[in-house]
Amino acid sequence: MVVGTGTSLALSSLLSLLLFAGMQMYSRQLASTEWLTIQGGLLGSGLFVFSLTAFNNLENLVFGKGFQAKIFPEILLCLLLALFASGLIHRVCVTTCFIFSMVGLYYINKISSTLYQAAAPVLTPAKVTGKSKKRN
């Protein structure tokens, strides 16, 4: 199901806010065991994806369709936000958030490039049809 840019901006902003609030409400529980600290990093990675989606949708509304997110400032700003939110829980959450965010960013980039990039024409070299002389 495809939603518009404005609706996607509202949904991703709301999910970012709810995820950040949930991470702060349950920060003691997320920091209590090893597995939950890893889950805290996974939640931070989700915060990264949702905030990047909201930021890019806002740019598309302001600057027009076809505006793409670049590494600086969009991706770094959203990554720092997610790492800061994970750091408020536990130090290990920062590391796992970074790892999960990089994996998520790789797959977002892979899906985006297959959907939105035009295929470059492949040039094949022309076959030479003629006699070639051997030189010694």
From Swiss-Prot:
GO terms for biological process: protein N-linked glycosylation; protein N-linked glycosylation via asparagine. Residues 24-34, 109-136 are cytoplasmic. One of its GO terms (cellular component) is oligosaccharyltransferase complex. GO terms for molecular function: enzyme activator activity; protein-macromolecule adaptor activity. The chain crosses the membrane at residues 6-23, 35-55, 76-108. Keywords: Endoplasmic reticulum, Membrane, Phosphoprotein, Transmembrane, Transmembrane helix. It is found in: Endoplasmic reticulum; Endoplasmic reticulum membrane. It comes from the Eukaryota. A motif (Prevents secretion from ER) lies at residues 133-136. Pfam families: Keratin_assoc. Expressed in skin, heart, placental, liver, skeletal muscle, kidney, pancreas, keratinocytes and dermal fibroblasts. The keyword Transmembrane helix applies. Subunit of STT3A-containing oligosaccharyl transferase (OST-A) complex that catalyzes the initial transfer of a defined glycan (Glc(3)Man(9)GlcNAc(2) in eukaryotes) from the lipid carrier dolichol-pyrophosphate to an asparagine residue within an Asn-X-Ser/Thr consensus motif in nascent polypeptide chains, the first step in protein N-glycosylation. N-glycosylation occurs cotranslationally and the complex associates with the Sec61 complex at the channel-forming translocon complex that mediates protein translocation across the endoplasmic reticulum (ER). Belongs to the KRTCAP2 family. PANTHER family: KERATINOCYTE-ASSOCIATED PROTEIN 2. This is Dolichyl-diphosphooligosaccharide--protein glycosyltransferase subunit KCP2. It comes from Homo sapiens (Human).
